[in-house]
Curated annotation (Swiss-Prot):
Transport of potassium into the cell. Likely operates as a K(+):H(+) symporter. One of its GO terms (molecular function) is symporter activity. This is Probable potassium transport system protein Kup 2. The keyword Membrane applies. It catalyses: K(+)(in) + H(+)(in) = K(+)(out) + H(+)(out). The gene is kup2. Belongs to the HAK/KUP transporter (TC 2.A.72) family. Keywords: Cell inner membrane, Cell membrane, Ion transport, Membrane, Potassium, Potassium transport, Symport, Transmembrane, Transmembrane helix, Transport. Coiled coil: none annotated. It comes from Rhizobium etli (strain ATCC 51251 / DSM 11541 / JCM 21823 / NBRC 15573 / CFN 42). It is found in: Cell inner membrane. The chain crosses the membrane at residues 18-38, 61-81, 107-127, 143-163, 176-196, 211-231, 255-275, 293-313, 345-365, 371-391, 402-422, 429-449. It is a multi-pass membrane protein.
Length: 633
């Protein structure tokens, strides 16, 4: 009796937890794609409004939207990519890390694919908040046209408040994200259901033949409107990127039970409304609702777009942390805003970069119609990159043959390339903005990676082999350095070479500690490393120990905490009797270098932007000794 009751209680708790994950996924994962109905159909109709929209065009466009959602979101992301995880983590960099683990790090195609995908995502993280919030506030123009001039400043004010709040964390309000977004999807579904009966011909859009027929007869205009049709799936990358936060089943359940049906009903309702009232093509989303409901819907839409923006910002923070740990960016200051959830982080430099970009976009474009033309390129580009990485995943991880992997993904790849081509037609109309943003970010990441590789090669060639140094220093002679009590830890990224900071300490202080640790921190190509694989201790001589500490690319690189695990490995030391020796690099430009002059200057600027290793690795500040060294590049 008691056992049965306990089992039932556990089942209820398990179901409650699962429902909570589903609701949370709706708020975070689907916030972006859930705001697309605000503008997607309106923008797709725009090329046809001058001559009046016709049944063939409305049904064809809605059919394209339905099947774009079905093929790209349902088949590619929900059913396939959510299974292509790296120990439960998803996203472009996570998939890249898994492939590097399987195929090696020195695969240029993989490396540049990861850089491009990451850069495109950051560009998308600037455009999404600006476009979605302006689209929501523009519903106020239907209440009174006088609101039109206030949309940009109101949007900017909301963005400033949102970005300013990031440093305090979102834990206090995130519990409301899911319920508010659920309400938003119900409101969208209700708006669609009310109007589908306006013209039942819209149900013909369910037949994919109508989508193909539209493309066959629309000619060049058909390719142009594909760029707007693609707006229906912006935000799909979030499904994959947030896999680690919610898990595969809750994300899939949320899509099939609420999100997908609500989107289909809303788009069908917008189409039926325009078929029955062609003038509604000016703003079909908000015109679906009666006058008395317009203000509440605008307010709910604004909340939904703020939540969608928050999800994109959080994703950008997470991507930046992964990029830092994988060596694509310099050490950035990362603050944890929750004591219990390590996924809730704040990256001040990324926050400032995004806010600056968002405000520039709001005031440069002025309205969502203009900004929508710039949208899509970054998203389609990121999706094409993900499909390319997924092809390698099928071959390297799942063992598919080239022909089988091609058969699985080539049709999808062709569809996405067509969408990318359609979006590239908008380059002159503002599409250059996300391209320029992505190129700038990619250049920074490539320069940092190339510069770090060059410095490591330089050190490997110029520094003394560690084993030779230890043999010479352990020989007893009249010139041997004085031995002092305690432990000295020397951080280095090239563990088989003698750290310069160790040589400088000997040269200037003429002492050697009783215990000397050559410490190297490694980032593995997996999200998390368990404690039993965290450290590796190698005794090199009576006074020298090599210590390797391994972190995953989603781990907090807390070296002090990791050192506490050394006791379990038989290596004992007292933290208050330990000194951490760090080398502070001062880069000096030289004529002969492995980097072009422009890249040298960028790399030196990035080097100056990086935070101190003592802060990044959470070393006790009162136990850190820094010695300067000049490095010629």
């Amino acid at each position: 009796m008691t056992s049965t009751h306990a089992d039932k209680t556990g089942d209820v708790a398990s179901r409650t937890g699962f429902v909570g994950l589903v609701v949370g996924a709706i708020g975070v994962v689907y916030g972006d794609i859930g705001t697309s109905p605000l503008y997607a159909f309106r923008e797709a109709l725009r090329p046809f409004t001058a001559d009046g929209v016709h049944e063939f065009e409305v049904i064809g466009l809605i059919s394209l939207m339905i099947w774009t959602l079905t093929i790209i979101v349902t088949f590619k992301y929900v059913l396939f990519l959510l299974r292509a995880d790296n120990d439960g983590e998803g996203g472009t960099l996570s998939l890249l890390a898994l492939l590097m683990k399987k195929m090696g790090r020195n695969v240029p195609v993989l490396f540049f694919a990861g850089l491009i995908g990451s850069a495109l995502f950051i560009g998308d993280a600037m455009i999404t908040p600006a476009l979605s919030v302006m689209s929501a506030l523009e519903g106020l123009k239907l209440i009174t046209p006088a609101f039109a001039e206030y949309v940009p400043p109101l949007s900017a004010a909301i963005m400033i408040v949102l970005f300013a709040a990031q440093s305090r964390g979102t834990a206090a309000v995130s519990m409301f994200f899911g319920p508010i977004t659920v309400l938003w999807f119900f409101a969208m579904a209700a708006g669609g259901v009310i109007h589908i009966g306006d013209d039942w011909r819209i149900l013909a859009a369910i037949n994919p033949i109508n989508a193909l027929s539209f493309l066959a007869h629309a000619g060049t205009v058909g390719l142009i409107v594909l760029g707007a049709v693609f707006l229906t799936v912006t935000g799909a990358e979030a499904l994959y990127a947030d896999l680690g936060h919610f898990g595969r089943r809750p994300i899939q359940m949320a899509w099939f039970v609420l999100v997908f049906p609500a989107l289909l009903l809303n788009y069908l309702g917008q189409g039926a409304l325009v078929l029955s009232q062609p003038a509604a093509s000016a703003d079909p989303f908000f015109l679906m609702y009666p006058d008395w409901a317009l203000l509440p819907v605008v307010l709910l839409a604004t909340l939904a777009t703020i939540i969608a923006s928050q999800a994109v910002i959080t994703g950008a923070f997470s991507l930046a942390r992964q990029a830092v740990h994988l060596g694509f960016l310099p050490r950035l200051r990362i603050k944890f805003t929750s004591e219990t959830n390590t996924g809730q982080i704040y990256v001040p430099s990324v926050n400032l970069l995004l806010l600056t970009g968002v405000l520039m976009l709001i005031f440069s474009f002025g309205d969502s119609e203009s900004l929508a033309t710039a949208y899509g390129i970054s998203v389609t580009g990121a999706m094409v990159i993900t499909t390319m990485l997924a092809f390698q995943f099928l071959r390297a991880v799942w063992g598919y043959s080239f022909m089988l992997a091609s058969a699985a993904l080539l049709p999808l790849f062709v569809i996405e390339v067509v969408f990318l081509a359609a979006n590239l037609l908008k380059i002159q109309d503002g599409g250059w903005v996300p391209v320029a943003l992505a190129l700038a970010i990619m250049t920074l990441m490539w320069t940092w990676t190339r510069g770090q590789t060059y410095l490591k090669k330089l050190r490997a060639n110029n520094e003394i082999p560690l084993d030779s140094f230890i043999r010479s220093i352990e020989r007893k002679s009249d010139h041997s350095p004085v031995t002092v009590p305690g432990t000295a830890v020397f951080l280095t990224s090239v563990p088989d070479r003698t750290p310069n900071v160790l040589l400088h300490n000997l040269k200037h202080n003429h002492v050697l500690h009783e215990q000397n640790v050559i410490l190297t921190v490694w980032t593995e190509d997996e999200p998390y490393v368990p404690d039993n694989r965290r450290i590796k201790i190698s005794q090199l001589s009576p006074r020298f120990v090599r210590l390797d500490i391994n972190f995953g690319f989603m781990d907090d690189p807390d070296v002090t905490r990791a050192l506490a695990l050394c006791r379990e490995g038989g290596f004992k030391f007292e933290i208050m009797k330990t000194s951490f020796y760090l080398g502070r690099r001062n880069l000096v430009r030289t004529p002969n270098t492995g980097l072009p002059g422009w890249q040298e200057r960028i790399f030196m600027a990035l080097e100056g932007f990086a935070i101190d290793p003592s802060d990044y690795f959470n070393l006790p500040s009162n136990r850190v000794v820094e010695l300067g060294e000049q490095v010629a590049i």
